[in-house]
């Protein structure tokens, strides 16, 4: 049976590991160290570690694999293949070149578009109507290896980064399992990435989280769903942070300055730069838990002044 080392960390990686382990001999799982989580800073294992322990697979958690003693242990396993999916560290050539069939990665974009750590976020931020998964060879340069297989999936207006992560993790697992038989048999010729089409999905900055109400409504709508459920787009209301977790978009145009409020007893609408409307459905005022807009408008939102604007 083919011996595989699997490397991954978040929930996205779990279906890939589970599918691999159902058919192949996964001899080791490498994931990030346990991290403090939440206000109480409880030391919490990554999702992949939990899944690996349930499957009784040995787990390695080096802080920095490149300088870890565990690197030589992994090479000594003499695996046939290394598979990664959102692991979170650049791997040294000594490990990439050690397996018989090399090292491959399950990446959540249609490469060469969106190399980097936030491809799902950027697909939504940019208003894409489709994205997908690419399986490619691992090289030391970030997400730059030749492409082995690729599969597309649509993005709808009802999707956000959370729903797309779920869809892409399942798609990635399916594509990998469909690809491996021919790949291991040497029947697939990998295709180099077109350097003219390379784009990058760098980590989201705090500046990208803040809503600019002078922008078009569609752009703001894409920002809200692209940053949900993490890190969440925000604006300000009476100079205090105000997060918008979920919203819909109305192309109907209204008169009003960017950030102007149109509200009744149960709904809240905000005017964008082009006059179209953002309609928040799940929000989080400063110092409060997240809530549906109806609850807000029948509570603190009742006192919103018609002259109040978001972003001020």
Curated annotation (Swiss-Prot):
Signal peptide: none annotated. Its EC number is 2.1.2.9. InterPro entries: Fmt, Formyl_trans_C, Formyl_transf_N, Formyl_transf_N_sf, Formyl_transferase-like_C_sf, GART_AS, Met-tRNA-FMT_C, Met-tRNA-FMT_N. GO terms for molecular function: methionyl-tRNA formyltransferase activity. Keywords: Protein biosynthesis, Transferase. It catalyses: L-methionyl-tRNA(fMet) + (6R)-10-formyltetrahydrofolate = N-formyl-L-methionyl-tRNA(fMet) + (6S)-5,6,7,8-tetrahydrofolate + H(+). GO terms for cellular component: cytosol. PROSITE patterns: GART. (6S)-5,6,7,8-tetrahydrofolate binds at residues 109-112. It is an enzyme of class 2 (transferase). Pfam families: Formyl_trans_C (PF02911), Formyl_trans_N (PF00551). Belongs to the Fmt family. Attaches a formyl group to the free amino group of methionyl-tRNA(fMet). The formyl group appears to play a dual role in the initiator identity of N-formylmethionyl-tRNA by promoting its recognition by IF2 and preventing the misappropriation of this tRNA by the elongation apparatus. HAMAP family: Formyl_trans. This is Methionyl-tRNA formyltransferase.
């Amino acid at each position: 049976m083919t011996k595989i080392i699997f490397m991954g960390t978040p929930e996205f990686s779990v279906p890939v590991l589970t599918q691999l382990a159902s058919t192949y001999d996964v001899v080791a799982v490498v994931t990030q160290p346990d991290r403090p989580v939440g206000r109480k800073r409880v030391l919490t294992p990554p999702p992949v570690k939990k899944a690996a322990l349930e499957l009784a697979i040995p787990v390695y958690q080096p802080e920095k694999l490149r300088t870890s003693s565990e690197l030589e242990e992994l090479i000594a396993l003499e695996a046939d293949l290394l598979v990664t999916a959102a692991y979170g560290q650049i791997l040294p050539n000594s490990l990439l070149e050690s397996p018989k069939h090399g090292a491959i990665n399950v990446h959540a974009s249609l490469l060469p578009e969106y190399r980097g750590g936030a491809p799902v976020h950027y697909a939504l931020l940019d208003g894409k109507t489709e994205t997908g998964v690419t399986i490619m060879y691992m090289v030391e340069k970030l997400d730059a290896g030749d492409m082995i297989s690729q599969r597309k999936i649509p993005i709808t207006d009802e999707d956000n980064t959370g729903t797309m992560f779920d869809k892409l993790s399942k798609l990635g697992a399916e594509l990998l399992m469909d690809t491996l038989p021919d790949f291991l048999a040497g029947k697939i010729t990998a295709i180099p990435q077109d350097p003219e089409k390379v784009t990058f999905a760098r980590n989201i900055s705090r500046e990208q989280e803040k809503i600019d109400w002078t922008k078009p409504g569609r752009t703001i709508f894409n920002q809200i769903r692209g940053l949900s459920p993490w890190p969440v787009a925000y604006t300000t209301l009476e100079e205090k942070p105000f997060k918008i977790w979920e919203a819909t978009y109305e192309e109907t145009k209204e008169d009003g300055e960017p950030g102007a409020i149109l509200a009744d007893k149960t709904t809240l609408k905000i005017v964008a730069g082009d006059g179209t409307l953002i309609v928040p459905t799940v929000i989080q005022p400063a110092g409060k838990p997240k809530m549906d807009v109806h609850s807000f408008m029948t509570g603190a939102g009742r006192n919103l002044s018609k002259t109040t604007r978001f972003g001020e």
